[in-house]
């Protein structure tokens, strides 16, 4: 089950994709929005929908790290058909390389999305970490 753009739930265990950050669907009662021209769009929902579509009915396999995040979620990288969901999200512009934690692991995918104005890079947005800091 997809919780949001960077978190899934498998057998009641929440797994946060480490090293990336997706827009917030709901954070402290607030939704994160992006703007395409005058149109106001829920960028958190866009990321979640993209992830749902990428997983489809396929089996998800995750490599779980030993540590958890501050919300007690497991951290890891998850795959569909041996393809990293984190890399897919970042390369298509629906999540961001989170340099604070990733050591720029996804920077090539992010540059590709940015250069090609894919996903959120085609809109005005606030990075999720800035949105949380400001709210």
Could you describe each region identified by the protein language model?
Residues 1-135:
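Small beta-barrel nucleic-acid-binding modules, primarily SNase/OB-fold domains
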């Amino acid at each position: 089950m997809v919780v949001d753009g960077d978190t899934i739930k498998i057998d009641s265990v929440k797994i946060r994709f480490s090293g990336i950050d997706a827009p917030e669907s709901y954070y402290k009662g607030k939704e994160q929005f992006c703007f395409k021209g005058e149109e106001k769009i829920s960028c958190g929902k866009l990321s979640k929908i993209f992830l749902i579509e990428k997983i489809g009915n396929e089996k998800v396999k995750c490599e779980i790290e030993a540590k958890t995040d501050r919300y007690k979620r497991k951290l890891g990288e998850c795959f569909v058909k041996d393809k990293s969901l984190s890399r897919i999200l970042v390369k298509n512009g629906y999540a961001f390389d989170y340099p604070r934690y990733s050591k720029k692991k996804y920077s090539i995918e992010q540059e590709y999305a940015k250069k090609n104005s894919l996903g959120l890079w085609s809109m005005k947005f606030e990075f999720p970490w800035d949105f949380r800091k400001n709210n």
